[in-house]
Amino acid sequence: MTHWPSPAKLNLFLYITGQRADGYHTLQTLFQFLDYGDTLHIEPRHDGEIHLLTPVTGVENEDNLIVRAARLLMKAASESGRLPVGSGADISIEKRLPMGGGLGGGSSNAATVLVALNHLWQCGLSIDELATLGLTLGADVPVFVRGHAAFAEGVGEILTPVNPPEKWYLVAHPGVSIPTPVIFKDPQLPRNTPKRSIDTLLKCEFSNDCEVIARKRFREVDAALSWLLEYAPSRLTGTGACVFAEFDTESCARQVLEQAPEWLNAFVAKGVNLSPLHRELL
């Protein structure tokens, strides 16, 4: 049995710069990983079978991103003659990241499967090939596959590696799940934030264009941010529902965590520019 990190991410800023004819929104965002997340347990099989041993309530196994990623890699490696005969896997997951939280849990799970099985099966696909496969599963998957903090443009698929400060974060989940379309379909969502260079953006105060909509539509998000903002700079990650506050030290973050209201599920984690998944491969 092998064990693989599937880390969370934060969007340190997120700006919506437009909307394409196909409905997708163009954006500029800054991804950084956390040293906190799910763990995937993978046992290679030799009969060509893919088994997910920890199904998710309400999601058919074949629709789960974990299984879809495994089958996608199997198909791509097979078609290019790089899949050893009988390659398969038993996969289970220790879930710590909430669904609909804006921490990238599902995308991270898919990326971990692609990277781990490529290694375990010895398929030999490059990171570029894995990232291209990952993009077909979701716009956030490639950053997890590549494993380095990044400035993202387009619909999130154009990535430039960056090294923002590795701060400590108090991340809080207010107890609601926010489907991404709820935010992106809101008519009041800002959709024309001017595009700026990464150098300019890194010098500006960070914010998230989705935050005003999440706070308006979900009072729990508004309450969580109102509480966090009493202690430190705080904002929404992704389209929510998680919010985070940034601190220079772990002790400062933990002092605030001790004061968290009972209705708020929160944890402290360090921002890291190299994914814990990729540290495993070094």
Swiss-Prot record:
Protein name: 4-diphosphocytidyl-2-C-methyl-D-erythritol kinase
Sequence similarity: Belongs to the GHMP kinase family. IspE subfamily.
Gene Ontology BP terms: isopentenyl diphosphate biosynthetic process, methylerythritol 4-phosphate pathway; terpenoid biosynthetic process
Active site, renumbered: K9, D140
The protein's role, per its UniProt record: Catalyzes the phosphorylation of the position 2 hydroxy group of 4-diphosphocytidyl-2C-methyl-D-erythritol.
HAMAP family on file: IspE (MF_00061)
InterPro entries tied to this protein: GHMP_kinase_C_dom (IPR013750), GHMP_kinase_C_sf (IPR036554), GHMP_kinase_N_dom (IPR006204), IspE (IPR004424), Ribosomal_Su5_D2-typ_SF (IPR020568), Ribsml_uS5_D2-typ_fold_subgr (IPR014721)
Native source organism of the sequence: Salmonella schwarzengrund (strain CVM19633)
Metabolic or biological pathway, per its Swiss-Prot or TrEMBL entry: Isoprenoid biosynthesis; isopentenyl diphosphate biosynthesis via DXP pathway; isopentenyl diphosphate from 1-deoxy-D-xylulose 5-phosphate: step 3/6
